[in-house]
Amino acid sequence: MNSLGNLENYQKGFNESVVDITEPRIYFGLQTNDTIVTNSKTKKEFDYLSPDGSNVTNEYNGQAGLKLGFFDRMVFAISHGDTKLAFSSDISSESKIIANRNIINRAKAIMPYLVYDENPYLVVSDEGRLVWVLDAYTTSNYYPYSQKITVNNKEINYIRNSVKVLIDAYDGTTKFYITDRTDPIIMAYWKAYKGLFVDLDEKIPEGISKHFVYPEYLYNIQANVLKRYHNVQADVLYRAEDVWEVSTYNLTGNSSNTISQIQPYYTMVKTIDNSQNTLGLVVPYTISGKQNIVSYLVGSYQNGEANLKLYTYPEDSNVLGLMQLDTQIEQNEEIYKQIASLNVSGTKLTKNIVVVPVNNKLLYVEAIYQQYINEENALPILKKIVVASGNKVAIGNDLKEAFSNLVSQNAIGIEIENTEDIEDLIELIIKANNNLEQSSANGDWEMMGKDVEKLQSLVKKLEETYNKEKSKNNDLDITLDNTENKTENEKDKVI
């Protein structure tokens, strides 16, 4: 990567796939919190800098805002505590005041009974206009026989993504579309506030709906609940025997205090049951206390519908976990040297890792950044990329080089081991035996049968693990004996 970060390649990509935007100006967004006055009599609105260095100005022609008569100016001046608005000579009869420009606050002011996603996204309509997509939810804490969770200091046990709010970034036009008619709460709101929602028969324009993604707010809640409730067997749930955790990784690689859970992220995925690449949210899981990845959750938007699917690996699969990848990197002298050379005085290293499903395999991409800690406002600089797939790992200065090394002879083989050792199995056997004693004391014959099967399975697994460890130790003893014999023979030759 050159000093410009290959900007010429990015520019080339933009030129080849031009997005036709007819109105690029954003008056309504996430950071637009101030009330503004447009079309001033004396001051022109700065738009952009022309190639010759002169300022290009703009006049607002949208329908948003109120034209200000003298009485209106007095009212706004009093409400905002600003006398300039009332007596400024810059304001004419063509001037407009535009308020409520923060799109989330704007939606809340219109319909305060919904919960709004904190991560709206901007799309381009077929007409070339910028439109914000804001997901909205109905919630309740009265759903029967359902466990409550706390979200933003509020207890809920019911949530539905029943509304899509579309907000024009230029003129602030706000439309509420009902996307789930099976939700009784939103249908009650529809009957109570019929003028608020778009007609049920009116569909969201395809030029906008084709850009929809799985809502991150809902996904985070579902991914968290799934850690326990992926298993629907009552006895397993009651005993909390099959609890998952979101995979963790080391942010810096040099301190256990920097271990962090991987955050859900949008990426292009190609799952085993879908021939097309799809933009989706992904998070991998491990069994609580273990390191191997056992499953991953994909949230995507396909064929106009939200789709959430869990992909699990067989119990005996050894799928590389994120902490295991870090360990393999540290144990490999060639890769570790390249990373360690970046950790010089006055700098710190940070990492970010994503796991990308490709068919039934996982591709691991780890970016390593260097940042100068003594420089004010110093930005992290991408220095290395580590990629891994299957039992191979490679490193490069950029993504292209890392991938090239992964599929070449430069790739390094890694050993993926199941993290379940003999001590872990003994703990599980003790727990299973306690469960058997409890079900026996309760006279629960069905549960006793399940507990006996579980105990037998664990004992068998312990025996297999023990024999495997014993065989490995025997091989090591043979190797050491051969080494000692070879050394003695060499001594005899010298004598």
Where are these regions (language model features)?
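Soluble extracytoplasmic regions of secretory-pathway and membrane proteins
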Residues: 1-442, 446-469, 473-484, 490-492
